[in-house]
Amino acid sequence: NNRNGIAITWNKIEGATGYYIYRDGKKICQVKKETTKYTDKGANKNGTLYGFSIMAYKTINGKTYKSVISPGVKSCFLKGSSIDILTKKAGNTHVSWRKNSKANGYQVQYSTKQSFKKARVKTVKGQNKKSAKLSKLKNTKSYYVRLRGYVRKGKKKYYSHWSTCAKIIPWNGKWEFAGYSKIHTDSAVLYFSSASKVKNKTVCINAGHGTKGGESVKTLCHPDGSAKVTGGSTAQGAIRATSINGGTTLNDGTPEAKATLNLAMIVKQKLLKAGYNVLMVREDEDAQIDNIGRTVYANNCADYHIALHYDSTSSNKGAFYIGVPDNQSYKNMYPVSKNWKKHNKLGKNLVWGMENAGVKIYGKGEMAIDLTQTSYSTIPSVDLEVGDKSSNHSNKALKTIASGIVKGMNK
Protein backbone atom coordinates (compact mmCIF):
# COMPACT_ATOMS: atom_id res chain seq x y z
CA ASN A 1 0.00 0.00 0.00
CA ASN A 2 1.01 3.57 -0.59
CA ARG A 3 -0.97 6.82 -0.52
CA ASN A 4 -2.15 6.52 -4.12
CA GLY A 5 -2.93 2.84 -4.53
CA ILE A 6 -1.07 -0.46 -4.46
CA ALA A 7 2.59 -0.56 -5.47
CA ILE A 8 3.73 -3.64 -7.42
CA THR A 9 7.35 -4.71 -7.98
CA TRP A 10 8.81 -7.70 -9.85
CA ASN A 11 12.07 -9.28 -10.89
CA LYS A 12 13.64 -8.13 -14.13
CA ILE A 13 13.46 -10.65 -17.00
CA GLU A 14 16.55 -10.50 -19.21
CA GLY A 15 15.71 -9.81 -22.84
CA ALA A 16 12.14 -8.72 -22.15
CA THR A 17 10.81 -5.75 -24.12
CA GLY A 18 8.30 -4.97 -21.39
CA TYR A 19 5.58 -6.28 -19.11
CA TYR A 20 1.82 -6.54 -18.93
CA ILE A 21 0.20 -6.01 -15.54
CA TYR A 22 -3.10 -7.69 -14.68
CA ARG A 23 -5.51 -6.83 -11.89
CA ASP A 24 -8.19 -9.40 -11.11
CA GLY A 25 -7.53 -11.09 -14.46
CA LYS A 26 -7.81 -7.92 -16.56
CA LYS A 27 -4.84 -6.26 -18.24
CA ILE A 28 -4.52 -2.74 -16.83
CA CYS A 29 -1.09 -1.58 -17.97
CA GLN A 30 1.83 -2.15 -20.29
CA VAL A 31 5.26 -0.98 -19.10
CA LYS A 32 8.68 -0.87 -20.74
CA LYS A 33 11.65 -3.04 -19.88
CA GLU A 34 13.46 -0.39 -17.83
CA THR A 35 10.67 -0.52 -15.26
CA THR A 36 10.22 -3.16 -12.57
CA LYS A 37 7.68 -1.30 -10.45
CA TYR A 38 4.26 0.20 -10.95
CA THR A 39 1.62 1.82 -8.74
CA ASP A 40 -1.94 0.86 -9.57
CA LYS A 41 -3.85 4.02 -8.70
CA GLY A 42 -7.09 2.30 -9.65
CA ALA A 43 -6.68 -0.15 -6.77
CA ASN A 44 -7.78 2.41 -4.22
CA LYS A 45 -11.12 1.31 -2.79
CA ASN A 46 -10.76 1.23 0.97
CA GLY A 47 -10.77 -2.30 2.40
CA THR A 48 -10.88 -4.02 -1.01
CA LEU A 49 -8.80 -7.10 -1.85
CA TYR A 50 -7.16 -7.13 -5.30
CA GLY A 51 -5.26 -9.83 -7.20
CA PHE A 52 -2.24 -9.04 -9.40
CA SER A 53 -0.11 -10.94 -11.90
CA ILE A 54 2.63 -10.05 -14.40
CA MET A 55 3.46 -11.24 -17.92
CA ALA A 56 6.72 -10.48 -19.70
CA TYR A 57 6.80 -9.99 -23.46
CA LYS A 58 9.40 -9.59 -26.18
CA THR A 59 8.92 -7.96 -29.57
CA ILE A 60 10.98 -9.24 -32.52
CA ASN A 61 10.48 -7.86 -36.04
CA GLY A 62 7.09 -6.52 -35.09
CA LYS A 63 5.87 -9.79 -33.59
CA THR A 64 5.17 -10.09 -29.85
CA TYR A 65 6.04 -13.20 -27.85
CA LYS A 66 4.56 -13.57 -24.36
CA SER A 67 5.75 -15.48 -21.32
CA VAL A 68 3.43 -17.50 -19.15
CA ILE A 69 1.61 -15.33 -16.66
CA SER A 70 3.06 -15.15 -13.17
CA PRO A 71 1.33 -16.69 -10.15
CA GLY A 72 -1.20 -14.29 -8.67
CA VAL A 73 -0.49 -12.18 -5.60
CA LYS A 74 -3.20 -10.61 -3.49
CA SER A 75 -3.11 -7.28 -1.68
CA CYS A 76 -5.74 -5.26 0.13
CA PHE A 77 -5.82 -1.50 -0.21
CA LEU A 78 -6.34 0.18 3.14
CA LYS A 79 -6.55 3.94 3.33
CA GLY A 80 -3.90 5.46 5.57
CA SER A 81 -4.69 7.02 8.93
CA SER A 82 -3.18 10.22 10.30
CA ILE A 83 -2.18 11.33 13.77
CA ASP A 84 -4.76 13.70 15.16
CA ILE A 85 -3.36 14.67 18.56
CA LEU A 86 -0.12 13.65 20.28
CA THR A 87 0.55 14.82 23.84
CA LYS A 88 3.24 14.13 26.42
CA LYS A 89 2.34 15.30 29.91
CA ALA A 90 4.12 14.48 33.17
CA GLY A 91 5.28 11.08 31.94
CA ASN A 92 2.03 10.16 30.18
CA THR A 93 2.05 10.05 26.39
CA HIS A 94 -1.16 9.68 24.41
CA VAL A 95 -1.75 9.52 20.67
CA SER A 96 -5.09 9.72 18.91
CA TRP A 97 -5.96 9.33 15.25
CA ARG A 98 -8.80 9.44 12.77
CA LYS A 99 -10.14 5.92 12.55
CA ASN A 100 -10.60 3.96 9.35
CA SER A 101 -13.96 2.19 9.26
CA LYS A 102 -12.40 -0.73 7.34
CA ALA A 103 -9.45 -1.28 9.69
CA ASN A 104 -9.43 -4.08 12.26
CA GLY A 105 -6.73 -2.40 14.32
CA TYR A 106 -3.64 -0.20 14.29
CA GLN A 107 0.09 -0.23 14.87
CA VAL A 108 1.74 2.74 16.57
CA GLN A 109 5.50 2.97 16.17
CA TYR A 110 7.76 5.30 18.16
CA SER A 111 11.49 5.85 18.23
CA THR A 112 14.16 8.40 19.16
CA LYS A 113 15.30 8.25 15.52
CA GLN A 114 13.39 9.60 12.53
CA SER A 115 14.45 6.49 10.61
CA PHE A 116 12.49 4.51 13.25
CA LYS A 117 15.50 2.32 13.88
CA LYS A 118 15.03 0.22 17.03
CA ALA A 119 11.44 1.45 17.24
CA ARG A 120 8.90 0.22 19.75
CA VAL A 121 5.55 -0.94 18.37
CA LYS A 122 2.20 -0.88 20.12
CA THR A 123 -0.63 -2.85 18.52
CA VAL A 124 -4.14 -1.61 19.16
CA LYS A 125 -6.86 -4.13 18.31
CA GLY A 126 -10.40 -3.11 17.49
CA GLN A 127 -12.22 -1.39 14.64
CA ASN A 128 -13.43 1.49 16.79
CA LYS A 129 -10.16 2.19 18.58
CA LYS A 130 -8.71 5.62 17.90
CA SER A 131 -6.27 6.31 20.73
CA ALA A 132 -3.46 4.68 22.68
CA LYS A 133 -1.17 5.31 25.61
CA LEU A 134 2.55 4.93 24.92
CA SER A 135 4.92 3.74 27.62
CA LYS A 136 8.60 3.94 28.55
CA LEU A 137 9.28 7.33 26.96
CA LYS A 138 12.03 9.28 28.70
CA ASN A 139 11.29 12.89 29.63
CA THR A 140 14.58 14.24 28.25
CA LYS A 141 14.44 12.65 24.80
CA SER A 142 12.68 13.53 21.56
CA TYR A 143 10.49 10.85 20.00
CA TYR A 144 9.09 10.34 16.51
CA VAL A 145 5.66 8.72 16.31
CA ARG A 146 3.75 7.26 13.35
CA LEU A 147 0.93 4.79 12.83
CA ARG A 148 -0.77 2.56 10.30
CA GLY A 149 -3.96 0.54 10.17
CA TYR A 150 -4.37 -3.12 9.36
CA VAL A 151 -7.16 -5.33 8.07
CA ARG A 152 -7.52 -9.11 8.12
CA LYS A 153 -8.60 -11.00 5.03
CA GLY A 154 -8.76 -14.69 5.84
CA LYS A 155 -5.55 -15.64 7.62
CA LYS A 156 -3.55 -12.75 6.20
CA LYS A 157 -3.07 -9.28 7.64
CA TYR A 158 -2.69 -6.29 5.30
CA TYR A 159 -1.34 -2.89 6.37
CA SER A 160 -1.96 0.65 5.18
CA HIS A 161 1.00 2.93 4.48
CA TRP A 162 2.62 4.63 7.47
CA SER A 163 1.27 8.02 8.44
CA THR A 164 3.45 11.11 8.35
CA CYS A 165 5.25 11.19 11.67
CA ALA A 166 4.99 13.67 14.52
CA LYS A 167 7.82 14.59 16.88
CA ILE A 168 7.61 15.00 20.65
CA ILE A 169 10.03 17.75 21.71
CA PRO A 170 11.05 17.90 25.39
CA TRP A 171 11.94 21.11 27.22
CA ASN A 172 15.60 22.13 26.92
CA GLY A 173 16.88 24.22 29.81
CA LYS A 174 19.86 25.34 27.71
CA TRP A 175 17.72 27.27 25.21
CA GLU A 176 18.03 31.06 25.25
CA PHE A 177 15.57 32.58 27.76
CA ALA A 178 14.61 29.10 29.04
CA GLY A 179 15.54 30.16 32.56
CA TYR A 180 12.83 32.84 32.55
CA SER A 181 10.01 30.30 32.14
CA LYS A 182 8.45 28.93 35.34
CA ILE A 183 6.06 26.33 33.89
CA HIS A 184 7.28 23.88 31.25
CA THR A 185 6.67 20.28 32.35
CA ASP A 186 4.70 19.35 29.21
CA SER A 187 6.27 18.80 25.79
CA ALA A 188 5.52 20.51 22.49
CA VAL A 189 4.76 18.45 19.38
CA LEU A 190 5.93 19.06 15.82
CA TYR A 191 3.65 17.80 13.05
CA PHE A 192 5.16 17.27 9.60
CA SER A 193 3.20 18.13 6.47
CA SER A 194 2.39 15.36 3.99
CA ALA A 195 1.40 17.82 1.25
CA SER A 196 2.74 17.18 -2.24
CA LYS A 197 4.59 20.51 -2.09
CA VAL A 198 6.06 21.20 1.34
CA LYS A 199 7.29 24.68 2.20
CA ASN A 200 10.05 23.64 4.65
CA LYS A 201 8.73 26.23 7.10
CA THR A 202 7.34 25.60 10.56
CA VAL A 203 4.59 27.67 12.17
CA CYS A 204 4.04 27.53 15.92
CA ILE A 205 0.32 27.74 16.67
CA ASN A 206 -0.27 28.81 20.25
CA ALA A 207 -3.84 28.39 21.53
CA GLY A 208 -3.90 31.20 24.07
CA HIS A 209 -4.32 30.45 27.80
CA GLY A 210 -5.16 26.95 29.11
CA THR A 211 -2.53 26.42 31.84
CA LYS A 212 -3.93 25.51 35.24
CA GLY A 213 -2.12 27.32 38.04
CA GLY A 214 -0.49 29.79 35.68
CA GLU A 215 -2.07 32.82 37.33
CA SER A 216 -0.37 32.07 40.65
CA VAL A 217 3.12 32.32 39.15
CA LYS A 218 4.95 35.50 38.13
CA THR A 219 7.61 35.95 35.45
CA LEU A 220 9.65 38.94 34.26
CA CYS A 221 7.87 41.08 31.67
CA HIS A 222 11.18 41.74 29.89
CA PRO A 223 14.36 39.65 29.80
CA ASP A 224 16.43 42.66 30.92
CA GLY A 225 14.19 43.24 33.94
CA SER A 226 12.85 46.60 32.72
CA ALA A 227 9.27 47.80 33.21
CA LYS A 228 6.38 47.44 30.77
CA VAL A 229 6.01 50.51 28.56
CA THR A 230 2.25 50.09 27.97
CA GLY A 231 -0.71 48.66 29.82
CA GLY A 232 -2.60 45.53 28.85
CA SER A 233 -3.47 42.51 30.95
CA THR A 234 -0.56 43.75 33.09
CA ALA A 235 -0.29 47.42 34.06
CA GLN A 236 2.22 49.83 32.56
CA GLY A 237 5.32 50.09 34.76
CA ALA A 238 5.08 46.51 36.04
CA ILE A 239 8.27 44.45 36.25
CA ARG A 240 6.58 41.08 36.63
CA ALA A 241 3.44 39.61 35.07
CA THR A 242 1.29 36.53 35.48
CA SER A 243 3.13 33.67 33.79
CA ILE A 244 -0.07 32.92 31.86
CA ASN A 245 -3.58 34.02 32.73
CA GLY A 246 -6.84 32.14 32.43
CA GLY A 247 -8.28 34.33 29.68
CA THR A 248 -11.72 35.85 29.40
CA THR A 249 -15.14 34.20 29.02
CA LEU A 250 -17.08 34.75 25.82
CA ASN A 251 -20.62 36.09 26.05
CA ASP A 252 -22.17 32.66 25.53
CA GLY A 253 -20.20 31.25 28.46
CA THR A 254 -17.43 29.61 26.44
CA PRO A 255 -14.00 30.02 28.07
CA GLU A 256 -11.58 31.85 25.80
CA ALA A 257 -9.11 28.98 26.22
CA LYS A 258 -11.64 26.55 24.71
CA ALA A 259 -12.43 28.84 21.77
CA THR A 260 -8.74 29.41 20.98
CA LEU A 261 -8.06 25.66 21.16
CA ASN A 262 -10.91 24.91 18.75
CA LEU A 263 -9.48 27.46 16.34
CA ALA A 264 -5.91 26.22 16.77
CA MET A 265 -6.86 22.68 15.78
CA ILE A 266 -8.48 23.93 12.57
CA VAL A 267 -5.54 26.22 11.76
CA LYS A 268 -3.16 23.30 12.31
CA GLN A 269 -4.91 21.11 9.74
CA LYS A 270 -5.16 23.88 7.16
CA LEU A 271 -1.48 24.79 7.51
CA LEU A 272 -0.42 21.14 7.21
CA LYS A 273 -2.53 20.79 4.07
CA ALA A 274 -0.90 23.96 2.69
CA GLY A 275 2.58 22.47 3.14
CA TYR A 276 3.67 23.98 6.46
CA ASN A 277 4.98 21.97 9.36
CA VAL A 278 3.18 22.94 12.57
CA LEU A 279 4.49 23.15 16.13
CA MET A 280 1.71 22.83 18.71
CA VAL A 281 2.33 24.03 22.27
CA ARG A 282 -1.21 23.27 23.49
CA GLU A 283 -3.67 20.66 22.23
CA ASP A 284 -5.83 20.04 25.25
CA GLU A 285 -7.59 21.81 28.09
CA ASP A 286 -4.48 22.09 30.25
CA ALA A 287 -0.97 22.50 28.82
CA GLN A 288 1.68 23.08 31.47
CA ILE A 289 3.72 25.54 29.43
CA ASP A 290 3.58 29.25 30.31
CA ASN A 291 3.80 32.23 27.96
CA ILE A 292 7.59 32.46 28.06
CA GLY A 293 7.87 28.69 27.70
CA ARG A 294 5.67 28.69 24.62
CA THR A 295 7.71 31.53 23.15
CA VAL A 296 11.00 29.75 23.85
CA TYR A 297 9.67 26.58 22.20
CA ALA A 298 8.67 28.62 19.13
CA ASN A 299 12.04 30.40 19.03
CA ASN A 300 13.92 27.11 18.87
CA CYS A 301 11.58 24.83 16.92
CA ALA A 302 9.68 27.07 14.47
CA ASP A 303 10.09 29.88 11.94
CA TYR A 304 6.94 31.80 12.93
CA HIS A 305 4.87 32.11 16.11
CA ILE A 306 1.14 32.89 16.08
CA ALA A 307 -0.73 33.11 19.39
CA LEU A 308 -4.54 33.03 19.12
CA HIS A 309 -6.72 35.12 21.44
CA TYR A 310 -10.09 36.82 21.85
CA ASP A 311 -10.21 40.41 23.13
CA SER A 312 -12.04 41.14 26.40
CA THR A 313 -14.40 43.74 24.90
CA SER A 314 -18.00 42.91 23.93
CA SER A 315 -18.59 45.08 20.86
CA ASN A 316 -17.83 42.45 18.20
CA LYS A 317 -15.25 44.92 16.93
CA GLY A 318 -13.34 42.51 14.70
CA ALA A 319 -9.87 41.01 14.46
CA PHE A 320 -6.51 42.71 14.87
CA TYR A 321 -2.92 41.93 15.77
CA ILE A 322 -0.89 43.25 18.68
CA GLY A 323 1.84 45.43 17.24
CA VAL A 324 5.11 46.51 18.83
CA PRO A 325 4.78 49.84 20.74
CA ASP A 326 6.53 52.84 19.21
CA ASN A 327 8.76 53.27 22.25
CA GLN A 328 12.45 53.67 21.52
CA SER A 329 13.75 52.09 24.72
CA TYR A 330 11.54 49.06 24.11
CA LYS A 331 12.56 48.79 20.45
CA ASN A 332 16.22 48.99 21.50
CA MET A 333 15.86 46.07 23.94
CA TYR A 334 17.10 42.66 22.77
CA PRO A 335 15.53 40.59 21.21
CA VAL A 336 12.86 43.17 20.24
CA SER A 337 15.55 45.28 18.57
CA LYS A 338 16.29 42.58 16.00
CA ASN A 339 12.75 41.41 15.35
CA TRP A 340 10.10 44.11 15.87
CA LYS A 341 9.83 44.88 12.16
CA LYS A 342 9.35 41.15 11.45
CA HIS A 343 6.65 40.93 14.13
CA ASN A 344 4.70 43.80 12.60
CA LYS A 345 5.10 42.46 9.07
CA LEU A 346 3.73 39.08 10.11
CA GLY A 347 0.80 40.75 11.84
CA LYS A 348 -0.04 42.87 8.80
CA ASN A 349 0.10 39.82 6.52
CA LEU A 350 -2.22 37.82 8.77
CA VAL A 351 -4.75 40.66 9.02
CA TRP A 352 -4.59 41.07 5.24
CA GLY A 353 -5.26 37.35 4.81
CA MET A 354 -8.19 37.33 7.21
CA GLU A 355 -9.75 40.40 5.62
CA ASN A 356 -9.47 38.77 2.19
CA ALA A 357 -11.11 35.64 3.60
CA GLY A 358 -14.08 37.69 4.81
CA VAL A 359 -13.18 38.19 8.49
CA LYS A 360 -14.25 41.48 10.07
CA ILE A 361 -11.22 43.63 10.92
CA TYR A 362 -11.01 46.21 13.72
CA GLY A 363 -9.90 49.64 12.47
CA LYS A 364 -6.54 49.36 10.73
CA GLY A 365 -6.05 45.90 12.16
CA GLU A 366 -3.40 46.78 14.73
CA MET A 367 -3.15 47.70 18.41
CA ALA A 368 0.25 48.39 19.99
CA ILE A 369 0.84 46.66 23.35
CA ASP A 370 3.99 45.60 25.20
CA LEU A 371 3.57 41.81 25.40
CA THR A 372 5.66 39.15 27.14
CA GLN A 373 5.48 37.09 23.94
CA THR A 374 7.10 39.65 21.66
CA SER A 375 9.52 40.74 24.40
CA TYR A 376 11.14 37.27 24.30
CA SER A 377 10.65 36.34 20.62
CA THR A 378 13.65 35.78 18.35
CA ILE A 379 11.51 34.85 15.32
CA PRO A 380 8.57 36.67 13.66
CA SER A 381 5.90 36.49 16.35
CA VAL A 382 2.44 37.94 16.81
CA ASP A 383 -0.55 37.86 19.15
CA LEU A 384 -3.60 37.62 16.90
CA GLU A 385 -6.87 38.78 18.46
CA VAL A 386 -9.35 37.05 16.16
CA GLY A 387 -12.41 38.73 17.70
CA ASP A 388 -13.85 39.57 21.10
CA LYS A 389 -16.39 38.19 23.58
CA SER A 390 -19.30 38.88 21.21
CA SER A 391 -17.72 37.39 18.09
CA ASN A 392 -19.10 34.38 16.27
CA HIS A 393 -16.95 31.37 17.13
CA SER A 394 -18.97 28.68 15.35
CA ASN A 395 -17.08 26.03 13.44
CA LYS A 396 -17.88 27.83 10.18
CA ALA A 397 -16.52 31.13 11.53
CA LEU A 398 -13.36 29.44 12.80
CA LYS A 399 -12.76 27.85 9.40
CA THR A 400 -13.00 31.28 7.79
CA ILE A 401 -10.48 32.71 10.25
CA ALA A 402 -8.16 29.74 9.70
CA SER A 403 -8.35 30.15 5.91
CA GLY A 404 -7.41 33.79 6.37
CA ILE A 405 -4.41 32.87 8.49
CA VAL A 406 -3.17 30.52 5.76
CA LYS A 407 -3.68 33.25 3.15
CA GLY A 408 -1.64 35.61 5.30
CA MET A 409 1.16 33.08 5.71
CA ASN A 410 1.25 32.52 1.96
CA LYS A 411 1.51 36.23 1.15
Per-region residue spans from a language model:
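Conserved hydrophobic/aromatic "anchor" residues
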Residues: 10, 19, 50-52, 57, ...
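Extracellular low-complexity, O-glycosylation-prone stalks/linkers
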Residues: 13-28, 102-123
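Catalytic-site microenvironment of enzymes
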Residues: 90, 169-411
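Short coil/turn motifs at secondary-structure junctions
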Residues: 15, 26, 59, 102, ...
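Short, surface-exposed beta-strand/beta-hairpin micro-motifs centered on an aromatic residue
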Residues: 7, 35-39, 94, 129-133
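Short beta-strand segments within Ig-like beta-sandwich modules, predominantly Fibronectin type-III
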Residues: 28-35, 122-128
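Pro/Thr/Ser/Gly-rich low-complexity, intrinsically disordered linker/stalk tracts
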Residues: 1-15, 46, 62-102, 139, ...
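Beta-strand-rich modules
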Residues: 38-65, 134-157
